[in-house]
Amino acid sequence: MLKEPPKNSREKTKNLLLTLQDKICSGLENVDGKGKFTEESWLRDEGGGGRSRVLKNGSIFEQAGVNFSEVQGKELPQSIISQRPEAKGHEWFATGTSMVLHPKNPYIPTVHLNYRYFEAGPVWWFGGGADLTPFYPYLSDVRNFHNEHKKACEKVDQDLHKVFKPWCDEYFFLKHRNESRGIGGIFYDYQDGSGNIYRGNNQKGEASKASQNIGRSNLNWDDLFSLAENCGQAFLPSYLPIIEKRASQAYSSKEREFQLYRRGRYVEFNLVWDRGTIFGLQTNGRTESILMSLPPLARWEYGYKARKNSREEFLTSIFTKPQDWLNDKELEKFCIENNIFD
């Protein structure tokens, strides 16, 4: 049986996620130098509300959205009950901060972050993660993003990243395209300190295998709160150095067209596969905030084929497939030889 969360669990997680929203927005405004976030507060008829912040047409970001929400309800959607049937019949509470950034320059990756907390009767859990979607990737940028999140996980438990990295690869996968959305990062869900770390549906996947090797989780509520805090704080150091390196990199209409084409994959994932989008729409969430993740511009092209050994081909042949980004020496050698390391 789960241990009860602290009496102030809801207020504590709410404050953590509000602070995360503030820090991220401040950091992004500083690096953009031109754009400013506009805030819109909203209330939900069934209980709760949030604040949506969007930056448009900055010097770096074509569109950046950082949302906070805190919502309550009486009827849980089927998508939650199917995962945690013991929550059925209980009033529920959910709070989260989510972010999607769509930069102008195709050499700066799109990035997504989400950290959340949920309670319903005897059930509670933390979830979250961050993932990077480059269009013209460099291995050094990919490594920095992964390494910062690995360090954040290991502050709480040395084993978590071994599960969260492959879980991210598994979750952000477009089954209808048979490719990853990007180069991954970390992803976790339904973390309540009981049972195995992995709580996904693919019991034959790499995340499940890693979790089985590790065994049962012994993390408590405070550990999982610290995990969300550490991982949230890891975002800016994982991403801002990429902006600083790539913001002045020149690009042509060809790279811009490819960026818009690949953004189409982002749209496809978010509307077809993403559980957060589905949960928000099923619970009468604020549609504008839920769909904030979509890029302002995207395009589709029938039967697109990249030129052999081009940067565009390297994206689909290497950087949309799960890799051991931090340790694979053959991958490092290939990237150096093809000028896509740094």
UniProtKB/Swiss-Prot annotation:
It is an enzyme of class 1 (oxidoreductase). The active site is at H112 (proton donor). Pfam families: Coprogen_oxidas. Homodimer. It comes from Prochlorococcus marinus (strain MIT 9301). The gene is hemF. Pathway: Porphyrin-containing compound metabolism; protoporphyrin-IX biosynthesis; protoporphyrinogen-IX from coproporphyrinogen-III (O2 route): step 1/1. This is Oxygen-dependent coproporphyrinogen-III oxidase. Keywords: Chlorophyll biosynthesis, Cytoplasm, Heme biosynthesis, Metal-binding, Oxidoreductase, Porphyrin biosynthesis.
